[in-house]
């Protein structure tokens, strides 16, 4: 394994960590409706659990309401039940074959709780990035030990890995700030 392989690998893994963090943030409710909120809701479709997006069309009715249109009429009750049981604090209402999912306004206390959750998720993501840095530095040390690279090369590569770490940690901080602002906006 070369220095370039190590740097390339750690950057790809850091980018995947950022993507996973973005997905986690998308699941945190802000009071504003977005279809991504229901992405992880699973519906019982003839005995197997499938994502809601595979049995229904998700649309935004307005800023505070998601419209869910199941493709089969007999699925309306099952989709509504799945949304209700998804533990998102949502109360869907059915009108014919359209399920309306209004977003209840967040209380001040709930907003503060959510900002704490966002900060916690951010810290978890930063720890993942730092662990990747540690793994890369250990791989570099192994290359020096095996006499494949010089200590100067290791130091330069280590500096590059640190720059990648700083860049990704800053990106996480920015995402956390943006999400907190979104949550605290009434």
Swiss-Prot record:
One of its GO terms (biological process) is cytoplasmic translational termination. The keyword Metal-binding does not apply. This is Ribosome-recycling factor. The keyword Protein biosynthesis applies. Responsible for the release of ribosomes from messenger RNA at the termination of protein biosynthesis. May increase the efficiency of translation by recycling ribosomes from one round of translation to another. Pfam families: RRF. Belongs to the RRF family. Keywords: Cytoplasm, Protein biosynthesis. Signal peptide: none annotated. The gene is frr. It is found in: Cytoplasm. One of its GO terms (cellular component) is cytosol. GO terms for molecular function: ribosomal large subunit binding. SUPFAM superfamilies: Ribosome recycling factor, RRF. It comes from the Bacteria. It comes from Burkholderia multivorans (strain ATCC 17616 / 249).
């Amino acid at each position: 394994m070369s220095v370039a392989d190590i740097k390339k690998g750690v950057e790809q893994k850091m980018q995947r960590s950022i993507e996973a963090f973005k997905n986690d943030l998308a699941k945190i409710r802000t009071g504003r409706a977005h279809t991504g909120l229901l992405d992880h809701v699973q519906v019982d479709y003839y005995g197997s659990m499938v994502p809601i997006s595979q049995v229904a069309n998700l649309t935004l009715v307005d800023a505070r309401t998601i419209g869910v249109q199941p493709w089969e009429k007999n699925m309306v009750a099952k989709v509504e039940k799945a949304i209700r049981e998804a533990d998102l604090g949502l109360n869907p209402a059915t009108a014919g074959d359209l399920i309306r999912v209004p977003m209840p306004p967040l209380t001040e206390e709930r907003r503060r709780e959510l900002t704490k959750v966002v900060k916690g998720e951010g810290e978890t993501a930063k720890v993942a990035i730092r662990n990747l840095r540690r793994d890369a530095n250990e791989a570099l040390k192994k290359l020096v030990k095996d006499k494949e690279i010089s200590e100067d090369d290791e130091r330069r590569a280590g500096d590059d890995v640190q720059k990648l770490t700083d860049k990704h940690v800053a990106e996480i901080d920015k995402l956390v700030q943006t999400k907190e602002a979104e949550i605290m906006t009434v």
